[in-house]
Structure formats: C-alpha cells, structure tokens
Amino acid sequence: MRIIFMGSPEFSVVALSSILNNTEHKIVSVYTRVPKPAGRGKVLTKTPIHTVAEMHGLTVYTPKSLKRIEEQDRIKELNPDVIVVVAYGLIIPKEVLSIPKYGCINIHPSLLPRWRGAAPIHYAILHGDSQTGVTIMQMNEGWDEGDILLQKKLSIDEQDNIETLSNKLSNLGGAMLVEVLNNIDNLVPVAQNEDNATYTNKIEDFHIDINETAEVACRRIRALYPRAFVFFNGKRLRILQASYYYDDSISSLKPSSILNSGMHIKCKGNTILVPLVVQMEGKTLCSIKDFVCGYNVKDYSIT
C-alpha cells in the first residue's frame, strides 16, 4: 500500500519505524509539525519524526494547516491508500479523511472510549488505573470517536511514570500498526460505546497539591514527570520520584508539615509523602539525602 504518515513527537517514531522495518508498504510522504525554537538558545528544532524521516530519505511536509485546498490537492496527488496518524498535532479535516481508499487510521494510547483527547497516558496514571492500552481506530470527524480496528491492553506498573509508560505504549502501538496494515482488508470495525466515554484535557498545571493524599501526590509526580513541583519556602522544588506511607499518629498535624530531617511531608488523611529525587529551581537534580544536607528542612515551609 501507499502510505502517508502523519506524526510529530517521540511517541510516533516507533510507529514510523515499524512500517519501514517490518512491512513492504511504501511511505510516499511524511507530514509533521513545523520546526520550532527550543532550548535556552531558542534554536529552530525539527520534530523527532522529521529527523527520522529525513534519515530514511523520505519526503517531509510541514504545513501549518490541512484545511487549505492546495494542501488537500497535494495529498490527492500523492494517492495514498491509507493515512496513518500518530500524535500529529493538527486537525484532519473531513476532506482529507475521505481521500485514501482505507481512510485515515489513528494510534491512540488508551482503551477507547476511555480517555479520549490530548492526555490519555497522563490521565491513566493520575486516576490510578491498573491498566491501559492502545487503540487503533478508523478516524472520523469526532474527537477520538472512530470505530475500533484493533485494541490491546497493557498493565500499568506502580512505578511507571509518563516516560516509561509512553515507551511501552509506543512499542505496543508500533507492533499493532503492522498487524492492522497487513490485515486491513479483513478487519471488522467496531463502534465505540458512547456511554463509557471519558475525556482528557491538555495539562498545564504541574503543582502538587499537598492537601490531597500522598498517594494522589505520587500519582501526580509520576504522571507529570519530570515537571511536578511544590514550593519550598517560595521556590519551585521539582519532585521527580517519591513514595508514600500511612501513619495514624500524625492526625493532629496539618498538611504540609515537615516531619523530620528526611523531609517527609504530611498530606491529607494521615498520609506522608517521601520525596526521593528532587531538583531546586536553577540547580541540578539530586537525591533527597543530598538535598537535605544543605538545609535544616524543618525550618522551611512546603506549599
């Protein structure tokens, strides 16, 4: 088949590589987001997919929108049998959805219809889900509402963070994509159950609420890795790894109390958050053991 691949972040690289390395299908072009300034020097940086595509000698297009007639005409000229979309970042208009023989298919890292939207992996961790998975669906005009072509489950380990779980789901999605492309004529699409649909939003707040339980705080640290933070005496302190425990003897203490020199933090419901790896703003990351050597932490406040 002739395939147009649309993707942008690291998550989509495995899917592209899986087509290149494990199928006989031809990728006629790759679509990705335009290069953006990144880093302290604001150097114009290509997306991971852009870089990988160029390494393989593939033609890359970076339109700002697919709604323009000229862009749609170019896709028609490429004559794709199918368009594969993996975390592309642009809306696919109905005019494009209808161009390929087999339409557009999307890899979504959740067990649809649970966790539709922009942050399904984050939400699975935040809500304490014991399992998640990958859904490959036939795209329509809705928000992750298309019929399911293939779906597989994956257990979430207690120590998984957004990085480790994304890698696992990316690998699973790549293997599933090969299966779908090689059997596309024999697949029977299954409609999603709208009664079970849940939705996610892009996450913009990375603050850890100490007034929640320590278990919830740990989920947030894992889901927002490595950006979750508390304020330590007014300065941002990132917590990259943590554990928690219960202690009924501390019920009289208010949340945010620092219990000892190891910086165990009282949270809601007699739960204690134990930071393990931290990073003060402007500093390098370090173990909590090294961090507390520089402070008498019980004299400081956590918010």
Swiss-Prot record:
InterPro entries linked to this entry:
Fmt, Formyl_trans_C, Formyl_transf_N, Formyl_transf_N_sf, Formyl_transferase-like_C_sf, Met-tRNA-FMT_C, Met-tRNA-FMT_N
Record Pfam families: Formyl_trans_C, Formyl_trans_N
Q: Which CDD domains match?
A: FMT_core_Met-tRNA-FMT_N, Met_tRNA_FMT_C
Protein biosynthesis among the record's keywords? yes
Main EC class of this protein?
transferase
A GO term from the CC aspect: cytosol
State one molecular function term (GO). methionyl-tRNA formyltransferase activity
Keyword terms, alphabetized: Protein biosynthesis, Transferase
PANTHER family in UniProt: METHIONYL-TRNA FORMYLTRANSFERASE, METHIONYL-TRNA FORMYLTRANSFERASE, MITOCHONDRIAL
Question: What this chain does, per the record?
Answer: Attaches a formyl group to the free amino group of methionyl-tRNA(fMet). The formyl group appears to play a dual role in the initiator identity of N-formylmethionyl-tRNA by promoting its recognition by IF2 and preventing the misappropriation of this tRNA by the elongation apparatus.
Q: What is the official name of this protein in its record?
A: Methionyl-tRNA formyltransferase
Q: What is the organism field in this record?
A: Ehrlichia ruminantium (strain Gardel)
Taxonomic classification: Bacteria, Pseudomonadati, Pseudomonadota, Alphaproteobacteria, Rickettsiales
Q: Which gene encodes it?
A: fmt
